[in-house]
C-alpha cells in the first residue's frame, strides 16, 4: 500500500486545512496517510477542531511557523527529515508555502520518489515589494524543479503560475479543485437566520452585509467599509456590516470605521452600523443571517468564504481577482468589481442592496454550482486518481 505524507503549514481557519483534512480522512483506502502540521500564529484562530472532528491525529512540527526564521526553519527541516526516514513515504504532498519549501527540500534530499505541492494561493503580487516578491518567485521556481507535479486549485491559478509567473512548465501542473462538506450549509436556514440575528441584535428587516476572513492588508477591508458607508448614505434601507474574522488590522479597521462616522461594536448591532465578531467557527450557522457576502481582496487563490456563501445560497459581491471568476457564476450568483475600484464596488453594492429581485435571483443556483465542483468526494477521487497515475508511472520506470 503506497504511503502518503501530507504536510501543511499550520491548522488555521481556511481552505488548506479543510483540503488536507478531507484528503487525509477520505482518500481511497488504497493509500496510508500521515498528516503533519506546523504551528499557527497567536493571532490566528485554530482549525484543529476540524481534524479532531474527523478523528485525525496529526503530528506537529513545533518549529514550523508561517514567518521566516532561519533557525526554526532549519530545525523544522530536520524534524521532517526524521519523520520521512521513519514513515518511508512513497508520496510527499505539501500544502501552502512554508510547508512547500521545507517539506519538498526534505523529501527531495531523502529520495522520496513522488513529490507534489498544492498552491492554495500565491504571494507574487499585492503582498510584498518588488525585490522580496522576486526572491519568493525564484525560490518557487527552484522548488518546482524538485517536484513531480504542482497542483493548482483552479484553472485561472494554473494560468497565472505557469504562463504569467512561469513557476514551472504548464505540463507540470494538474488542476484539482478544493473540496468541502457543503450539504451542512443547506440545513435549518430559517432557524439559523433567526438565531444569528437574535445573537447580534439584528432585526429581521435589516439588510446585512458580511465579510469573512483574516483582518490583514491583502484582504483590503478598507474598500468594503468605505463602500458600505457610501451605500448607507444613499439607501433608505437599514444596513448593517458584519465583519467575521480577526487579525493584525482589527484596531486600524475600527479606527477607520470611526473616521467614516460609522458606529461600531464587538457584540451587537442594536445601536451600531458595523459589528466585529472575531472568528465564528460554525460558519454554517452564521451565513443564513447574512443577505450579502462580500470580498474585497487585492489577491485571492480560491476563497473558501465564496464557496460557502454559494453553498448557503447567499448573494455575493467581490473584487475580480485571482481564481474568483472560476468560483462564482457572474451575473447568476455574484457581481464582480475591478480590483480596488471604490466607485465601481460602491455602485454595484448599491445595486445589489436596492434590487430585491436581483438578490433573490442570486440565491437560486449557488448550491448546485459549488456542489458539482467543490464536494470533498470529488476532491478525494481526483487526488486518488492523480496519486495512482504517478505511482504507476514510477513503477513502470523502475522496471525499465
Regions found by a protein language model. Give the residues of each.
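Conserved acidic donor-binding segment of nucleotide-sugar-dependent glycosyltransferases
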Residues: 330-331, 335-342, 351-357
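A conserved mid-protein helix/loop that constitutes part of the nucleotide-sugar donor-binding site
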Residues: 17-22, 207, 211-232, 241, ...
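Nucleotide-activated donor-binding/catalytic signature segment of Leloir-type glycosyltransferases, i.e.
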Residues: 254-278
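N-terminal strand-loop element at the rim of the active site
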Residues: 6-14, 18-72, 160, 164, ...
Amino acid at each position: 500500500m503506497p504511503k502518503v505524507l501530507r504536510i501543511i503549514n499550520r491548522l488555521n481557519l481556511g481552505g488548506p486545512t479543510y483540503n488536507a483534512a478531507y484528503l487525509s480522512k477520505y482518500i481511497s483506502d488504497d493509500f496510508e496517510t500521515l498528516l503533519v502540521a506546523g504551528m499557527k500564529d497567536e493571532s490566528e484562530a485554530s482549525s484543529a477542531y476540524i481534524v479532531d472532528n474527523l478523528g485525525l491525529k496529526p503530528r506537529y512540527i513545533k518549529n514550523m511557523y508561517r514567518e521566516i526564521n532561519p533557525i526554526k526553519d532549519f530545525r523544522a527541516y530536520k524534524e521532517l527529515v526524521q519523520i520521512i526516514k521513519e514513515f518511508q513515504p512513497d508520496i510527499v504532498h505539501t500544502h501552502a508555502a512554508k510547508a512547500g519549501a521545507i517539506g519538498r527540500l526534505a523529501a527531495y534530499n531523502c529520495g522520496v520518489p513522488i513529490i507534489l505541492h498544492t498552491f492554495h494561493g500565491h504571494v507574487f503580487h499585492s503582498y510584498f515589494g518588488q525585490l522580496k516578491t522576486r526572491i519568493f518567485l525564484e525560490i518557487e521556481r527552484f522548488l518546482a524543479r524538485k517536484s513531480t507535479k504542482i497542483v493548482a486549485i483552479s484553472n485561472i491559478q494554473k494560468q497565472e503560475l505557469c504562463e504569467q509567473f512561469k513557476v514551472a512548465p504548464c505540463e507540470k501542473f494538474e488542476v484539482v479543485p478544493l473540496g468541502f462538506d457543503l450539504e451542512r450549509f443547506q440545513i435549518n436556514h430559517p432557524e439559523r437566520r433567526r438565531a444569528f440575528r437574535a445573537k447580534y441584535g439584528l432585526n429581521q428587516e435589516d439588510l446585512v452585509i458580511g465579510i469573512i476572513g483574516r483582518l490583514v492588508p491583502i484582504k483590503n477591508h478598507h474598500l468594503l467599509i468605505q463602500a458600505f458607508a457610501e451605500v448607507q448614505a444613499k439607501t433608505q434601507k437599514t444596513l448593517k456590516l458584519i465583519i467575521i474574522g480577526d487579525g493584525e488590522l482589527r484596531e486600524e479597521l475600527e479606527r477607520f470605521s470611526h473616521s467614516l462616522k460609522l458606529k461600531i461594536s464587538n457584540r451587537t448591532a442594536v445601536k451600531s452600523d458595523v459589528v466585529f465578531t472575531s472568528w465564528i467557527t460554525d460558519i454554517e450557522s452564521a451565513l443564513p443571517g447574512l443577505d450579502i457576502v462580500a470580498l474585497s481582496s487585492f489577491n485571492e487563490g480560491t476563497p473558501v468564504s465564496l464557496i460557502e456563501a454559494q453553498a448557503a445560497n447567499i448573494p455575493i459581491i467581490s473584487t475580480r481577482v485571482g481564481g474568483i471568476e472560476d468560483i462564482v457564476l457572474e451575473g447568476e450568483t455574484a457581481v464582480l468589481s475591478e480590483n480596488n475600484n471604490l466607485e465601481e464596488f460602491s455602485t454595484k453594492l448599491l445595486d445589489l442592496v436596492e434590487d430585491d429581485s436581483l438578490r433573490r435571483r442570486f440565491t437560486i443556483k449557488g448550491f448546485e454550482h459549488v456542489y458539482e465542483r467543490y464536494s470533498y468526494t470529488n476532491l478525494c477521487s481526483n487526488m486518488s486518481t492523480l496519486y495512482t497515475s504517478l505511482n504507476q508511472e514510477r513503477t513502470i520506470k523502475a522496471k525499465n
